[in-house]
Amino acid sequence: MVRIAINGFGRIGRLVLRIALSRKNIEVVAINDPFITVDYAAYMFKYDSTHGRFDGEVSHDGKSLIIDGKKVLVFQERDPATLPWGAEKIDIAIDSTGIFKELDSAQKHIDAGAKKVVITAPSSTAPMFVVGVNEDKYAGQTIVSNASCTTNCLAPLAKIINNAFGIEEGLMTTVHSITATQKTVDGPSHKDWRGGRTASGNIIPSSTGAAKAVGKVLPELQGKLTGMAFRVPTVDVSVVDLTVKLAKPATYEEIKAVVKKASENELKGVMGYTEDAVVSSDFLGDTHSSIFDAAAGIQLSPQFVKLVSWYDNEFGYSTRVVDLVELVAKN
């Protein structure tokens, strides 16, 4: 049984807890969030505007959450280094704050007594692993990153296409649901002026490092992909539009067949496939990293094609976080 703690009880932290509770080999020992009291943590875990009410009993005793009779300690420390991870025998600390995402800052969990750390954000210093893409390269590193939700959607698709046909170059656009960093009304956003505009009433162009990050988990695609984002007024589920120049000619039917085969074999559970006339809400709660929309893609020529893949940027990503935790625990 691997003992885990969750630092940061936001959108990802709460969903990681939901998913981890369903895994028999994981025990969630503690959560930490300096901005959430234990009674409020119970309320936020029990009710979710996007994913619905938690299917179980949730209460608290003033110090711990009590979920279906199981106690989960709640701390309110700003500095992870002060957390009692050693005393609580924490094997893996999951950092979902979005703050402690580099090796030096995530090291605070190790200093506190945790054996390993999984970061739920892209990192420029910690090695990044995308389940289904490069998890076989994990060699026992102490601190790892699960990359971003968009990289988790894009990388499996890019791997399939590159292995089958070769990618010479490509551009990605993610049409991305609202996240917590955006504004309910126009407000200050000094680094990204557009990002400070009302989330619910605008399509907002934004930057993303998700496509470039694919080169970190698939070195053969280094320098071949870049991309951007449009933030749109939906609460969850996003979609990747990948336009690529192929090295080898292919028909769209051949591309569909290759993706479908991968989704049923080596990437089962990570890559999904659909030919239905779907829309974004059809993927709420979907646990795949990426669901290929066979009916949405288009082809201009045998070597130039646009591919479309959906992802629940909250639930699918959080599922992969827990998968990565299990992988790290085995090594």
Curated annotation (Swiss-Prot):
The record marks H176 as: Activates thiol group during catalysis. The active site is at C149. It is found in: Cytoplasm. GO terms for cellular component: cytosol; external encapsulating structure. InterPro entries: GlycerAld/Erythrose_P_DH, GlycerAld_3-P_DH_AS, GlycerAld_3-P_DH_cat, GlycerAld_3-P_DH_NAD(P)-bd, Glyceraldehyde-3-P_DH_1, NAD(P)-bd_dom_sf. Its EC number is 1.2.1.12. The keyword Lipid metabolism does not apply. It comes from the Eukaryota. It catalyses: D-glyceraldehyde 3-phosphate + phosphate + NAD(+) = (2R)-3-phospho-glyceroyl phosphate + NADH + H(+). CDD domains: GAPDH_I_C, GAPDH_I_N. Pathway: Carbohydrate degradation; glycolysis; pyruvate from D-glyceraldehyde 3-phosphate: step 1/5. Its main location: cytoplasm. GO terms for molecular function: glyceraldehyde-3-phosphate dehydrogenase (NAD+) (phosphorylating) activity; NAD binding; NADP binding. D-glyceraldehyde 3-phosphate binds at S148, C149, T150, T179, T208, G209, R231. The keyword NAD applies. Homotetramer. This is Glyceraldehyde-3-phosphate dehydrogenase 2. It comes from Kluyveromyces marxianus.
